[in-house]
Swiss-Prot record:
Its EC number is 6.3.4.20. It comes from Pasteurella multocida (strain Pm70). CDD domains: QueC-like. This is 7-cyano-7-deazaguanine synthase. Pathway: Purine metabolism; 7-cyano-7-deazaguanine biosynthesis. The gene is queC.
């Protein structure tokens, strides 16, 4: 994997949870910008799967990128959802799962933009995805584009919000990881489970989507190899 940036005048910050999607984005950013030009921002917001914070810290250190941890746990006092309530059952409520955290991605993008401007960084990368967005309205492309305009106007600064996974299925995200040469790394070191089970519970929506995508990708890869 290329670790030097052909455009050394640009830097990027990745919104980083230590999960499959954001770690894939981080590896792509390292390839595109160079490891010396990439930082990550991680958020502690009272998530029940706090093990992701440990994973994020370990991965950032392992890859040699600067990590900034931002505490936004105040959100836990003003909204309720199954992602922050350890006693709540994870289930679907209408078209939106009860794991949806109102305002989370808007808050993450705002805080990251504030940090990025202070560092002279314009490119902000987030792993949100519309194809497998699970009913989360703040994972849609229309939201990201709207937020990009809002942040630019609010801070009189030219941010570029980048969403490399926006139109990829989970299987295609696994394919991207494989193309980057980090499929096994993503499988072994990232955390996705909403329940906070280190190797995954295999039952929550996030685990199901991750495993389904992996099976689909490995199956299609195997078929392609047979056809060659």
């Amino acid at each position: 994997m290329q670790l030097t940036n052909p455009n050394r005048d640009r830097k990027a910050v990745v919104i980083f949870s230590g999960g499959q999607d954001s770690t894939t984005c981080l590896f792509q950013a390292i390839q595109d910008y160079g490891v010396e030009n990439v930082e990550v921002v991680t958020f502690q917001y009272g998530q029940r799967h706090a093990i992701e914070l440990e994973k994020a810290k370990w991965i950032a250190q392992d890859l040699g990128v600067k990590q900034t941890l931002i505490d936004t746990s105040v959100i836990k006092a003003i909204t309720q959802n199954a992602l922050m309530d350890e006693q709540a059952r994870i289930e679907q409520h209408g078209s939106t799962p009860n794991t949806f955290v109102d305002g989370r991605n808007a808050l993450f993008l705002l805080y990251t933009a504030i940090y990025a401007k202070g560092q002279g960084i314009q490119d902000i990368i987030t792993g949100v995805c519309e194809t497998d967005f699970s009913g989360y309205p703040d994972c849609r492309d229309v939201f990201i584009k709207s937020m990009n305009v809002t942040l630019n106007l609010a801070m009189d600064y030219q941010f570029h919000l980048k969403t490399p996974l926006m139109y990829l299925t989970k299987a295609q995200t696994w394919q991207l990881a494989d193309e980057l040469g980090v499929l096994d790394y993503i499988r072994q070191h990232t955390h996705t489970c909403y329940m906070g089970v280190e190797q995954g519970c295999g039952e929550c929506p996030s685990c199901v989507l991750r495993e389904k995508g992996l099976r689909e990708y490995l199956s299609s890869k195997s078929e392609a190899e047979i056809d060659v």
